[in-house]
From Swiss-Prot:
Top-level taxonomy: Eukaryota, Fungi, Dikarya, Ascomycota, Saccharomycotina
UniProt organism field: Ogataea parapolymorpha (strain ATCC 26012 / BCRC 20466 / JCM 22074 / NRRL Y-7560 / DL-1)
Function as written in the Swiss-Prot or TrEMBL entry: Required for efficient biogenesis of the 60S ribosomal subunit.
Keyword Coiled coil: no
Keyword terms of this UniProt record: Nucleus, Ribonucleoprotein, Ribosome biogenesis
GO cellular component terms attached to this protein's record: nucleolus; preribosome, large subunit precursor
Sequence similarity: Belongs to the RSA3 family.
Pfam families linked to this entry: Rsa3
Oligomeric form and interacting partners: Associates with nucleolar pre-ribosomal particles.
Protein name: Ribosome assembly protein 3
Amino acid sequence: MPNRRARKKRRTEDFSSSSASENDSDSESVTSVQEEQPDAPETYTIDGLDTQEVSDSTQVRLQQLNADRLASIEQSLSGNLKLDINAVRQIDDVREQLQNEYLKKLLVTYSEDLDALRQKTDFKENSLKTLARLLKESGNIFDDGTLKSLVE
């Protein structure tokens, strides 16, 4: 494959041709452009690189710095994890309060129906607990914003 200088020279010669043979030079320049394919990228290996030997004291110092850096990263991550856990607990507590208020609102709204159920002969104490849990959990169909607006 011709080197770059030869290709460039050929291209320059193609463009500097006379106007009488303009059509011929156009077809030649198209051909020369098509011949111009990028060279395959050179591959490098690390075997051929000159590397400097690092002294033992430098390696020990680098390991110590890496260990210190790793320890500081671990501390910040554990601090962030504690913050996340606390935030999740706070969100869960607020959600629990909203569900309790939702249950109270439902109990007030359906108090007559609940009294009618309690007077039935097949109604038991566990039935009341199950019904209360069911009503409370029905608040899970709403997101926090909707549940808050229902309670207020």
